[in-house]
């Protein structure tokens, strides 16, 4: 089974980045085995994080989000790389 990339947009509840970073410092990412962190970016106001995650299925992602749902509202998008998108669109060009 191929791995799936997910772009996860994390909206920090009450714009409280301190609570999120404190938990991360104390507990780590709290990701279940099989869910791989790829990279992340945080907006300048420290209100949201754009995080790229990789796994074989959505269940592990849902489990991980459950560990953070008291501090973060999540928006999830399944994504492909630009190279994969180019291959998908090529027959239509």
Feature-to-residue mapping (PLM):
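Short S/T/G/P-rich N-terminal loop/turn motif that feeds into the first structured element of a domain
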Residues: 1-48, 56-60, 80-93
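Extracellular/luminal beta-rich ligand-recognition
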Residues: 51
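Short, flexible helix/strand-to-coil boundary loops that buttress conserved ligand/catalytic motifs
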Residues: 65
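Conserved short beta-strand edge segments in small beta-sheet-based binding/regulatory domains
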Residues: 71-82
């Amino acid at each position: 089974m191929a791995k799936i990339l997910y772009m996860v947009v994390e909206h920090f509840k009450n714009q409280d980045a301190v609570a999120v970073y404190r938990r991360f410092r104390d507990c780590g990412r709290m990701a279940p085995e099989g869910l791989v962190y790829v990279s992340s970016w945080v907006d300048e106001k420290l209100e949201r994080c754009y995080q790229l995650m990789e796994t074989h299925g959505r269940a592990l992602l849902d489990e991980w989000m459950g560990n953070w749902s008291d501090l973060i509202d999540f928006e999830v998008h399944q994504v492909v790389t630009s190279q994969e998108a180019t291959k998908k669109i090529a027959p239509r060009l």
